[in-house]
Each structure stands twice: as structure tokens, then as C-alpha cells.
Amino acid sequence: MNREQLKQELVEHYRWLRQNGNNDSHSGNASFRFHDEIWITPTGCCADTLMPEDLVCCHINGDKEEGASLDANLHIQVYQQNIDAKSVIHSHGPHAIALTLNGDDFVPVDFEGQYYFPHVPVISIPYEQYIEQAPEAVA
């Protein structure tokens, strides 16, 4: 896929999060890597009205254009630390949030869940350290 096709794909998937109740209209963010470019949702964007041309370009070296998501540094770190990562989707799904509220790790009870995700740790990272610690935790 070329850059423009990937931008369209990212916007569609970001909208689907909202349409399927896995994100509210203005929280979370998403990005994809295209060579040394990282295209990310703008800070405060609305999933319902986001267009491919609204995505903001950042670079693997850490440079960011104005308007990039407040979590752009986190996305950049994920790509720097995991060269196989092609996309990052960060949502605030109500079910995922509810599962983490007691602080226990999530262990699926169904066969398929156990097969694909036998153990999903709940990771607590202080806000001031999340850019440094989160990329390693999800790698």
C-alpha cells in the first residue's frame, strides 16, 4: 500500500473503534509507520469527522509537526524500540478499562482467548514515566 492508502485505512479503523463502542469520540489516538515517517491522529481530533488529510507527520528520529497527538512521543518510542511495529492503536474501550480497574491481570476463560492471549498483564506506569516504560512493556 502507498502512503495515501495507509492514511485512509488508519482513519477507517480509528472510526470503527468509535462506531463499535471501543472508544469515545475524542480520546485515544492511532498511527502507522511508512518508512521513516509516522502518521498520527492530531491531538483532540474527533473520530467521526477525521479525514486522511488531518493526520500529522512525525519522524522516526523524534521530530514532530505541530498538532500531533499528545501521545506522539509514545508512538515514536514504540516504533524505535520495535522495528516490526507498523501501527499503534490506543483506545479507551469501556470494557478494557473495566477489566483493569481492580489491578489484576486479565486471564481469558474461553478456549480461543486462552489460545491467543493466555495472560494479559495490567501494567501500572506513572504518567511521568510512561513514554520511557510503555514501549518496552508492549514490545
Enumerate the language-model features and the residues they cover:
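Glycine-rich flexible loops
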Residues: M1-A139
